[in-house]
Amino acid sequence: HQTRNPVFWGGDIHSFWTTDLHADAGNPDSAVVATEFVGTSVTSGGPPFEAFNSILGLNPHVKFFDSRQRGYVAVDVSEQQMLTRFQVVSDVLDPAASVSTLKRFAVEAGKAGAVPV
């Protein structure tokens, strides 16, 4: 049995990322074989946004990056898709802070790759 849409999770870089992993990492036109989601932390700051954002054009496999927000990742799974939501906290120092969705991606059943929704 071969998995057609594996998903990997990370989080030690304290920022949000969505990345499609290609069969040939040096060829962005090669087949997408998996998706990687990275979640930020609620309390720790992330890498400098401008420094990373300025080189994203050199990394076409990166579909989304943001290190300016604090929050967490929420995932809903059904037979049709896996829906990933990047949730952000309005103020990490306020116990009554609100939570909102920064970005959403779906990975469809049987198909590799993240699709913004």
Language model segments and positions:
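Long, structured stretches of catalytic cores involved in phosphate-ester chemistry, encompassing
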Residues: H1-V117
